[in-house]
Amino acid sequence: MLADAQQKILNSSQWLTADQLYTFAVSTGQNLCTTPNEWLSKGMIFSISNEETELFPLYALNPNAGYVLAKELVNIIEVFRERKDGWGMAYWFGSANGFLGGRRPQDLLQTDPEAVLAAAKDEVMGITHG
């Protein structure tokens, strides 16, 4: 069951190794001073481990802004830092979200990053009773 869930996430987006992500970003005109592994250590991106290979989500880069990191991603990662590991974040980004009208956060990260951040905060708050 876990393997099926992981495969679903791997199929939901394009995942790249650190070298592939770096090469991709540079090929689109980025002048990178840091590498994906440095982004990871600074909490600017997340990764998953699949068959001993560290993978990064391509949706973390904004194609409408020259493939720079999505502007709200660091804030979303900060919201989840103490609650979700890389796979936990990948599941969240790749799953339909009721707060987002059934859409997946990864599909809205570029077009409505503020809504995705609000959904992340809602996820952390959980159910509140009033």
Locations of the language-model features?
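Non-transmembrane "mature" sequence context
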Residues: M1-G130
